[in-house]
Amino acid sequence: NYTKKRLIAKNDVASLDVILGDNIRYNFDYYIDNGFYWSFGFNSKLTTFNRNITSNITDDAVFNTTANAINVDFFDLSNQAYLQTIFAQKFSLGGGLEFKVLKLESETLENTDPVFENSDYLSVFGFVKYDSFDKKYFPRTGWNFNSEIRSYLYSSDYKSNFERFSVAKADFGVAQTVFKNMTLKFQTEGGFAVGERSISYFDFILGGYGFQQVNNIKPFFGYDFLSIAGDSYVKLLLTADYEIFKKHHLNFSANFANVGNKIFDTIDTWFVQPNYSGYSFGYGMETVIGPVEIKHSWSPETKDHHTWFSVGFWF
C-alpha cells in the first residue's frame, strides 16, 4: 500500500494497493478534493481470480453443458473518471464514465472455445452516497446509504449479442448499540436490470464472504462464492455483534434473499418468503492491517457448511 498527498496538486491524494500471487490485483485511486465544489476522481482497478461459478451466470448456448458449476478464470480491468460534490452538506453526489475490459475463460470445457467472454464495455454512471458509521468494519452507531444507476452504451461485443441496458442498485444500513458492548446492525439492498436483454456477467451474483465486491458480485452467508445469480435481487442482513473485550468481537448474522430474472415485474415474485437464507457465527479482531475474521456459515436449504478466514483490509 502506498499513499501520497499533493502528488500533482496541493489538494489531491493518490493511493495504490497491490497484491501479487496467483490472483494479481491492484487498486489505484487519484482524487482532487475541492470541498463543496465539484471534485475530480480517477480509479483504475484490476481483479483476477479462478473459481467454480454457477452455470446460471452463463448462457447455455455458450457452454453447451448441463454442469451445475464451471471452473472459470476471471479478468476484470476497470478504469473510471468521475466528478463528485457534496449535496445538502451530507450526501456525496456524482457521476462519470467507465471503460472496462472483461475476460472469462475455462479450460475445463470440451469441444468449445475456452474463451467465452472477451469484450470491452463503456458505461456512464451516477451515484448518491451517505455514510455516518463510526467504523467501517465493526460499526457501533450510524447509518449509510448507497445508490447507483449505470448504463452500458457500447461493447466490442465478443459474442455479437450486445444490446444497451442499464443496472440500478441501492443499499441501506443502520447500526445501533442497544446496551454495553452489544450492537445490532440492519442492512437491506436490492437491484435490477433495465432493458430487453442484459449481459449475464453483470448479473447480481451472491455467495461467500470476505472479499471486495467487483461488478455485482456480493457476499451471502450459507452459500459458497458465486453460487446464486439473477438480473434482479433483494437481500436482508441482520447482525448482532458483541465486543467481548476491546477490539475483539463475537457476532451472529442471518441473511435472506430473493434472486432471479425480472423478479420486480410483479410483487408476488419478490415480496414473498425468501428463496435463499443463511446464517453465520464468527469471531473478529480489529488490527492495524484491518479486520481478522473467521466465520462459519450454513444454509437450511442446502445443508452445506462453509468456514471462511479473512485477514486485513478488503480490496
Model-derived regions, located:
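C-terminal hydrophobic structural anchor segments
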Residues: 239-275
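Gram-negative/organellar outer-membrane beta-barrel architecture
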Residues: 1-125, 208-218, 226-234, 291-315
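Outer-membrane beta-barrel proteins
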Residues: 25-27, 51-55, 102-108, 135-137, ...
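Outer-membrane beta-barrel strand-turn architecture
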Residues: 6-8, 34-36, 85-89, 132-134, ...
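Solvent-exposed, glycine/polar-rich loop segments of beta-barrel outer-membrane systems
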Residues: 114-115, 120, 201-213, 259, ...
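Transmembrane beta-barrel strands of outer-membrane/channel proteins
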Residues: 16-20, 42-50, 56-60, 95-101, ...
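C-terminal outer-membrane beta-barrel translocator/porin domains of Gram-negative envelope proteins
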Residues: 121-129, 133-245, 252
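A short pocket-lining beta-strand/turn micro-motif at the edge of beta-sheets
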Residues: 234, 246-250, 275-279, 288-292, ...
